[in-house]
């Protein structure tokens, strides 16, 4: 039998790029010829991440295409959604991505893969794959729960008769009773008013989801069995749950090479953690796209200090104040250093290495799905602080269904990545202490540790994710190609 050749084309944002690279590495480790597609400016991250797989002899490579920045008035070199600082820039970025269909088709014509795995935002990938008679698999970068709950809310609009944005509603037609408020979900009033492009894009995404060959999900059966079953049996959707994809990086070197270069030496970070007791450190990080204003960062610093817990805090550039000395509380950094109470990392951190360390007992997170899964794989309970995208659904999975998280009380969904609503220091301190210093927190942390073992077993030989991938590869290998 000829070697199966699969193209992988992630949406151009770190939260989509990293799991897709992991997926390509996983496929290649199972004998597949894996080819990743990206733009010129993003290629360095891809090449670094696959280097060890190539050394081990796996058939994995990267092809690049040009991103049409200039055609849409975007700055030269602007090739990831993470760089967006306004709604207008994000909209232009999405429009520019539509023009990637033609160069993708040129690569499909030249290299003739047997299947295409493309991100859900590339809804036009169905048409591209159909031109060459190959199946298009849609990569959904969230959980089945979030996918199903969000679809139910979009379809049923259970918020439409509410008198206030803060009034609660129950998400209809799903296995669990999940309560949200209108302000916590994207609604047409907020995301699509005067923006027909966004309306049209989500309509196209929904249609492509229904028409594609099937959906690949970065999750595992034991994490959300009711929703995996619901997806297949009630929605009738062909889906393969092959995660957690980050566990394909089972060597320290793989983990360290994943994503951007850390702004702290990994050994320095791990040495600091080695000096701490098990379950004593709170890790605080809000991913690659979240940007808080100065007032919120000030409250976060005060909340961490008032909690009395040791912490590692990954600080990205503040959106309205480049100099962190302007928003750090007076003497904060000095007190943290002198008391050896915390480690502040400015920029990018080796997140997976940190979460896997036994000293880490809690993860304050925006609930992006990659970060959520990395916390699950590390056996770390979460303080949930969702901001945008599907993150409020991910929060509900952690706090209400799995019961491995405590909410900080975030109430406002936003389309842009800055949060105008300030979560007060008292709420932050209370949530952290509830998880780290109260009896209830012990049970929550124990449930999180049990999930870690289930995640590991899922990707091992005979595990649910391993078996789902095996079934998919058999199916793709027997697909009748032109």
Swiss-Prot record:
EC number: 2.4.1.238
Keywords carried by this UniProt record: Glycosyltransferase, Transferase
InterPro entries for this protein: UDP_glucos_trans (IPR002213)
GO molecular function: anthocyanin 3'-O-beta-glucosyltransferase activity; UDP-glucosyltransferase activity
Claim: Ligase is one of the keywords in the record: no
Domain of life: Eukaryota
Reactions the enzyme catalyzes: delphinidin 3,5-bis-O-beta-D-glucoside + UDP-alpha-D-glucose = delphinidin 3,3',5-tri-O-beta-D-glucoside + UDP + H(+)
Annotated positions binding UDP-alpha-D-glucose: 349, 351, 366, 369-371, 374, 390-391
Upregulation: Significantly inhibited by Al(3+) and Co(2+), moderately by Zn(2+) and not by Mg(2+), Ca(2+), Mn(2+), EDAT or EGTA. Competitively inhibited by UDP.
Annotated active site: 16 (proton acceptor), 119 (charge relay)
PANTHER family per the UniProt record, alphabetical: GLYCOSYLTRANSFERASE, SCOPOLETIN GLUCOSYLTRANSFERASE-LIKE
Job description of the protein: Specifically glucosylates the 3'-hydroxy group of delphinidin 3,5-di-O-glucoside to produce gentiodelphin. Shows a strict specificity for UDP-glucose as donor.
Family according to the record: Belongs to the UDP-glycosyltransferase family.
Protein's UniProt name: Anthocyanin 3'-O-beta-glucosyltransferase
Species of the source: Gentiana triflora
């Amino acid at each position: 039998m000829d070697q199966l050749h699969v193209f992988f084309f992630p949406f151009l944002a770190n939260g989509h790029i990293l799991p897709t690279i992991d997926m390509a590495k996983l496929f290649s480790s199972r004998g597949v010829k894996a080819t990743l597609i990206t733009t010129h400016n993003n290629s360095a991250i891809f090449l670094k991440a696959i280097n060890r797989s190539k050394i081990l002899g796996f058939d994995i490579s990267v092809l690049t295409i040009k991103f049409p920045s200039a055609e849409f008035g975007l700055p030269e070199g602007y090739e990831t959604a993470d760089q967006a600082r306004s709604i207008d820039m994000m909209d232009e970025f999405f429009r520019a991505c539509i023009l990637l269909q033609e160069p993708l088709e040129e690569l499909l014509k030249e290299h003739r893969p047997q299947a295409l795995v493309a991100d859900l935002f590339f809804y036009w990938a169905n048409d591209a794959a159909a031109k060459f008679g190959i199946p298009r698999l849609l990569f959904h970068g969230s959980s089945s729960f979030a996918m199903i709950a969000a679809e139910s809310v979009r379809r049923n609009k259970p918020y439409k008769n509410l008198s206030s944005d803060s009034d609660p509603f129950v998400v209809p037609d799903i296995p669990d009773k999940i309560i949200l408020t209108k302000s916590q979900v994207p609604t047409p009033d907020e995301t699509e008013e005067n923006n027909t492009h966004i309306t049209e894009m989500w309509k196209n995404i929904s249609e492509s989801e229904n028409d594609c060959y099937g959906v690949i999900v970065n999750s595992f059966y034991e994490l959300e069995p009711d929703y995996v079953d619901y997806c297949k049996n009630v929605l009738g959707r062909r889906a393969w749950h092959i995660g957690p994809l980050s566990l394909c990086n089972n060597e320290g070197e793989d983990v360290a090479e994943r994503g951007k270069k850390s702004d702290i030496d990994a050994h320095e970070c791990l040495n600091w953690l080695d000096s701490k007791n098990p379950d004593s450190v709170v890790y605080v990080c809000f991913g690659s796209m979240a940007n808080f204003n100065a007032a919120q960062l000030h409250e976060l610093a005060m909340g961490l200090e008032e909690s009395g817990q040791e912490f590692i805090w990954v600080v990205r550039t503040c959106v309205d104040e480049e100099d962190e000395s302007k928003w750090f509380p007076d003497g904060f950094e000095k007190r943290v250093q002198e008391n050896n109470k915390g480690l502040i990392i400015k920029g990018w951190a080796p997140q997976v290495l940190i979460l896997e360390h036994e000293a880490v007992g809690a993860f304050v997170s925006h609930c992006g799905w990659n970060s959520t899964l990395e916390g699950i794989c590390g056996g770390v309970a979460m303080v949930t602080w969702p901001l945008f995208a599907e993150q409020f659904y991910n929060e509900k999975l952690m706090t209400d269904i799995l019961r491995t998280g405590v909410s900080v009380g975030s109430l406002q969904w936003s389309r842009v990545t800055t949060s105008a609503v300030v979560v007060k220091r008292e709420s932050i301190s209370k949530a952290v202490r509830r998880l780290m210093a109260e009896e209830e927190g012990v049970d929550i942390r124990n449930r999180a540790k049990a999930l870690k073992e289930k995640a590991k077993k899922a990707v091992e030989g005979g595990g649910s994710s391993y078996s789902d991938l095996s079934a998919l590869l058999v199916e793709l290998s027997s697909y009748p190609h032109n």
